[in-house]
Curated annotation (Swiss-Prot):
This is TBC1 domain family member 8. Residues 433-466, 1034-1070 are annotated as: Disordered. GO terms for molecular function: GTPase activator activity. The record marks R551 as: Arginine finger. Residues 437-447 have a biased composition (Basic and acidic residues). May act as a GTPase-activating protein for Rab family protein(s). Residues 145-212, 285-353 form the GRAM domain. Keywords: GTPase activation, Repeat. Residues 455-466 have a biased composition (Polar residues). The keyword Repeat applies.
Length: 1134
């Protein structure tokens, strides 16, 4: 590569370089000792010096210097790892610069001109290799060269970043370099003559955590299946850990959770991922999680600022976030003040005059006649320019539609204010108000546009006056809050509103506030008519999803009158079916029916649909799919929170997995299925405001309230009874309606009544005792535990596959486990470096366990070469192709692990007849095709002669009569012919020749090679004769007379085949015709030679093959990717 020119003085330098060639202005040199075979003392000394100093000359032993005539100062301008690479740079210099330099008279001009050209080449090279995105591109390019030389990965394996650190080996630290690439974590150390290489694929990592040990307070520990590795002494450990966490998360989800995981657009192409992309992804994920925004939102700018908060009459310090469709603000003090401004609600963005009291201010005006003042913005010009551009795009793509909701009083104020045609301050943006909601309903009528609680008044709903008065007080408090803090989605969100939510949202405002807190109101306003179209497209269709929906409709709140008739059930059916049509990746999952039925009680049908979208796609990501990965991740996070927040309970209950399992339904249904409905909706209020944090802290509060009984419980069943009874007796004293029990009410035989817990008290305790968890902490825990959950699914898949395969093969379970790891790694390596192949065709978590990982023909060939005992030299790859075609029953060009192990089991543990049968099948269709690349070459071997006798003499004077032996063996085999599942077709002469070539290849380098060759020559001669006899017997009738004489002279017990075989055959016929030979003939012939029998029946050890395969699997793949093999790469046994 080209180097940034730096002057060096060579007059008194040690002779560390040897000049290879030179010109007037350039010198090409080689590092002394490189390519000399290590025999010379000076070369060995230079090599040792480079190793100790970690010199770049170890990986780039060639260089080109710029020399100006008459000067002792030289400038390195290029280096190379190979002679070919450095020669390409030399040729470029001769062709493009050498003739031009002769024009210059001034030496300084020559140096300046060459240096300028080289710097331009470096800029072009870094642009193409993404190094310009690094903070120090020169150092990154040097590290990239070392990474490629040391680990010899294919070109597709891109380096993301690198760090200097120590890797602990027991109590001994090894100083070296940590390289983080898109698929691997690599470590290299060379100290005192000892070289250490570690290669850990990200998909093998089971834990990634920060720990402390006796020697150091902070280390990064990486846990794989077999080992733990500790890395320490980083300059910035926080940065390193975040990058590692992001790389592990992205790679694991891309390769193991591709069912529902969608990468950010910048990360779609793994080979283009950079350190900055990963840092941006981490910031994006925090931003979307904190404000609970759509996944497609991309953060563009973050800046420190202060926001004028009229309720406190001062400016509040915080940060402003600008994304595709939102302007958001978060105060520096957690929970003090947050604001979410959808750009579709923004009318104008203006810069105000800069003053000492209001430095760098901007004003953001929204349609509800509110304005937000931001000050102290450092890069105000660029921020406002970007905001105006995105505002114009949002208004152009989504013209704003206004809805006027008639309000009877101040308590039912509209979410959006009515407006007429409005022109904003850009002049060229017109916001056209659509027809009102009543007009749209006439155009596309919805059966029941009101919440179901308004349509179905429950019997006995006449509540006591005290409950009604408390409801009125709540409504009054909320209206006062709206006046001071705003009533739209753009309201100021402070600790005061959190307290109001914890007290319980009034039923008349519940649906509307759910829409505001989740920002589903923006989706609703941005997609007029979308839900109606979905309903029209989805209703009447019949599929597996609709059948599941129909089955669960009558299980959704059956005790509520709204779902005891067709009206409520029909609305539920429409919402669930429409969502399944919108998002086929999720479709329909159990528990969605319970959640949707509650949404329909308090929101209109279309509003309930968009609330469901917000919950499934933003607030509970990855929850609703057939593996419920998201819920399991939060379940695992909850288990860790129990250890942190309730240490006494964790100490008494050593196994917290039971409590975590019980809590799974809490997360999936938001307590709706295990708590009385009037109490559970209070939980949903907190969930829509605070997100999953509310469920975590409420779950901890429930466990703390029952900690004493849980500690004294004897088993999991008793713990479940304790929690079920407690949750069933949670009441909502402020609910205006009658109590509705949970789906799983607990019936107690106790004589004493169980104490009742008020939901408001429980929620207040949860906020006071466990409300200190921030969104950033929860997202970090989710990322940490997602690795464990995904690896847990991989372990489950592996165990299930092995459980199916073990009974059907004779390979030992521990060997089968290692074989599975090799099989999976073959699939993974293809995903790493062959992005053009559709990964989804090979890895599908929804398929049966045994079929989740499948490999194609090329991957199979690599594995076959590594683990098969039938090594045939250059013929091995051809044999692997034929075996793959044989195993690919459904012809989808993929095979699963079970088929792979079945053929290996025959090779290693099968009897001789099973092995010969497999070889036979490999040389007839479908395994052998007409276009087989080795089937057209004729077999030319002097051993294949048909003139050999059928009776051979032995050294002691005895003879071997093959005719009698073959006759008896064929009779014995014929008896078992009926037992065979399917009679195999006979083999043609062309196929038989290929069969013989395979046998000759298999015997190569065997200790008994000569005996085997002699034996197979004899057997081949015999089989060729048998085939020719059969050919003549099936030819024209003129041969019949010639065949009668030998039959008459032959003994009575001999049949015509052997009698005819005794005659001297002619040479090969010009055409093969009907020349055939059967499996029985081949097997019987082979059995006559003891050396062949010994070869096929000798015990074979698969363990040594597996050990060798683990060490060389990467090297073979790299070689196949046509990368120059400079040093053998071995995957460490982790």
């Amino acid at each position: 590569m080209w180097l940034k020119p730096e002057e060096v003085l060579l007059k008194n330098a040690l002779k560390l370089w040897v000049t290879q060639k030179s010109s007037c202005y350039f010198v090409l040199q080689r590092r002394r000792g490189h390519g000399e075979g290590g025999g010379r003392l000076t070369g060995r000394l230079v090599g040792a010096l480079d190793a100790v100093l970690d010199s770049s000359a170890r990986v780039a032993p060639f260089r080109i210097l710029l020399q100006v005539p008459g000067s002792q100062v030289y400038s390195p301008i290029a280096c190379g790892a190979t002679l070919e690479e450095i020669n390409r740079h030399w040729d470029w210099l001769e062709q493009n610069l050498l003739h031009t330099l002769s024009v210059f008279d001034n030496k300084d001009d020559i140096a300046s001109f060459v240096k300028g050209k080289v710097k331009a080449l470096i800029a072009e090279e870094t642009s193409s290799r993404l190094a310009e995105q690094e903070e120090e591109p020169e150092k990154f390019r040097e590290a990239l060269v070392k990474f490629e030389a040391r680990f010899n990965f294919p070109e597709a394996e891109k380096l993301v970043t690198y760090y200097s650190c120590c890797c602990w080996k027991g109590r001994v630290p090894r100083q070296g370099w940590l390289y983080l690439s898109i698929n691997h974590l690599c470590f290299y150390s060379f100290f005192l003559g000892k070289e250490l290489k570690l290669v850990i694929p990200w998909v093998d990592i089971q834990k990634l955590e920060r720990t402390s040990n006796v020697f150091l307070t902070d280390t990064i520990r990486i846990t794989t299946q077999n080992k733990e590795r500790d890395f320490s002494t980083f300059l910035n450990l926080d940065e390193v850990f975040k990058i590692m966490e992001q790389l592990a998360d992205v790679t694991l989800r891309r390769l193991l959770d591709n069912e529902v995981f969608d990468l950010d657009p910048d990360l779609q192409e793994p080979s283009q991922i950079t350190k900055r992309d990963l840092e941006a992804r981490a910031q994006n994920e925090f931003f979307r999680a904190f404000f609970r925004l759509p996944r497609e939102e991309k953060l563009h700018a973050v800046a420190d600022c202060s926001l004028w908060t009229p309720f406190s009459r001062c400016h509040t310090a915080g940060r402003i976030f600008s994304s595709d469709s939102y302007i958001c603000f978060a105060s520096r003090e957690d929970g003090c003040c947050n604001v979410v401004l959808p750009l579709r609600e923004v009318v104008s963005i203006e810069k105000m005059e800069d003053t000492s009291l209001l430095p760098n201010p901007i004003i953001v005006s929204i349609r509800s006649k509110m304005a937000f003042q931001f000050i102290e913005l450092k890069d105000r010009e660029n921020l406002v320019e970007g905001l105006l551009l995105r505002l114009k795009q949002v208004h152009a793509n989504h013209p704003v539609h206004y809805e006027t909701s008639p309000s009877d009083d101040d308590m039912a104020s509209p979410v959006f204010y009515s407006a007429s045609i409005c022109t904003d301050k850009f002049g060229d943006l017109e916001m056209v108000a659509s027809q009102s909601s009543e007009e749209r309903e006439e155009k596309r009528p919805l059966p029941h546009p009101e919440p179901l609680t308004a349509v179905f008044q429950q019997s006995g709903s006449q509540s006591p006056d005290s409950r009604l008065s408390r409801e009125q007080i709540k409504i009054s408090l909320w209206n006062d809050h709206f006046v001071e803090y705003g009533r739209t989605v753009c309201m100021f969100r402070t600790e005061k509103i959190r307290k109001l939510v914890a007290m319980g949202i009034p039923e008349s405002l519940r649906g509307r506030l759910w829409l505001l807190f989740s920002d589903a109101v923006t989706d609703l306003a941005s997609h007029p008519g979308y839900y109606g179209n979905l309903v029209e497209q989805s209703l009447g269709r019949c599929c597996l999803v609709t059948e599941e929906i129909e089955r669960d409709l009558h299980r959704s709140l059956p005790e509520h009158p709204a779902f005891q008739n067709e009206t409520g059930i029909a609305a539920l059916r429409r919402v669930l079916t429409a969502y399944a049509h919108r998002n086929p990746k999720i479709g329909y999952c159990q528990s969605m029916n319970i959640l949707t039925s509650v949404l329909l009680l308090y929101a209109k049908e279309e509003e309930a649909f968009w609330l469901l979208v917000a919950v499934c796609e933003r607030m509970l990501p990855d929850y609703f799919n057939h593996r419920v990965i998201g819920a399991q991740v939060d379940q695992s996070v909850f288990e860790e929170l129990i250890k942190e927040q309730l240490p006494e309970l964790a100490e008494h209950m050593s196994d917290l997995s039971a409590l975590a399992s019980i809590s799974l339904s809490w997360f999936l249904t938001l307590f709706l299925s295990i708590m009385p409905l009037e109490s559970a909706v209070h939980v949903v209020d907190c969930f829509f405001y605070d997100g999953i944090k509310a469920i975590f802290q409420l779950g901890l509060a429930v466990l703390e309230a029952n900690a004493e009984e849980l500690c004294s419980s004897k088993d999991d069943g008793q713990a479940l009874m304790v929690l079920s009874r407690f949750l069933d007796h949670i009441k909502n004293e402020d609910s205006p309606g009658p109590p509705i029990g949970s789906h799983h009410a607990f019936f107690s035989d106790d004589q004493e009544p169980y104490p009742v817990t008020d939901i408001a008290d429980l929620i207040r305790d949860s906020y006071e005792k466990f409300g200190n968890q921030s969104v950033e902490q929860i997202e970090h825990l989710r990322c940490k535990h997602r690795i464990r959950v995904l690896q847990g699914h991989e372990d489950t898949t592996k165990q299930n596959v092995l459980r199916v395969v073990i009974p059907e093969v004779s390979i030992l379970p521990e060997d089968l486990e290692e074989l599975y790891d090799l099989f999976k790694r073959a699939h993974m390596m293809s995903c790493y470096w062959e992005h053009h192949r559709p990964m989804a065709l090979r890895h599908d978590p929804s398929r049966p366990y045994a079929e989740q990982y499948r490999i194609d023909a090329r991957q199979f060939a690599h594995l076959f070469q590594l683990v098969s005992p039938w090594t045939c030299g250059v013929h091995t790859e051809i044999l692997a192709e034929r075996l793959f075609r044989l195993l690919d029953d459904n012809m989808d060009q993929l095979i699963e692990f079970k088929a792979f192990t079945s053929c290996l089991d025959i090779m290693y543990n099968g009897e001789m007849n099973e092995k010969i049968k497999l070889l036979y099948r490999l040389h007839i269709p479908p395994a052998l095709t007409e276009n087989d690349r080795d089937s057209q070459s004729p077999l030319k071997n002097p051993l294949l002669s048909t003139s050999r006798p059928l009776v051979l003499g032995k050294p002691n004077g005895d003879t071997i009569d093959y005719q009698k032996q073959l006759k008896q063996m064929i009779k014995d085999l014929a008896k078992e012919k009926d037992k065979m599942e399917k009679e195999l077709p006979k083999m043609s002469q062309r196929e038989f020749i290929q069969f013989c070539k395979t046998l000759y290849s298999m015997f190569h380098e065997d200790p008994e090679e000569n005996d085997l060759y002699q034996a197979i020559a004899t057997v081949t001669t015999l089989l060729l004769q048998i085939g020719e006899v059969g050919q003549r017997g099936s030819s024209s009738g003129s041969c019949s007379q010639e065949c009668e004489e030998p039959q008459a002279s032959a003994p009575p017990e001999q049949d015509s085949v052997f009698a005819e075989a005794g005659k001297s055959p002619q040479a090969f016929p010009e055409t093969e015709g009907d020349w055939t030979v059967s499996l029985e003939h081949i097997l019987a012939s082979l059995l006559t030679e003891q050396s062949l029998v010994n070869f096929f029946e000798k015990p074979l050890n698969i363990k040594s093959k597996l050990e060798n395969a683990k060490l060389n699997q990467y090297s073979l793949k790299v070689l196949e990717m046509s990368h120059p093999p400079q040093a053998e790469l071995k995957l460490n046994d982790l």
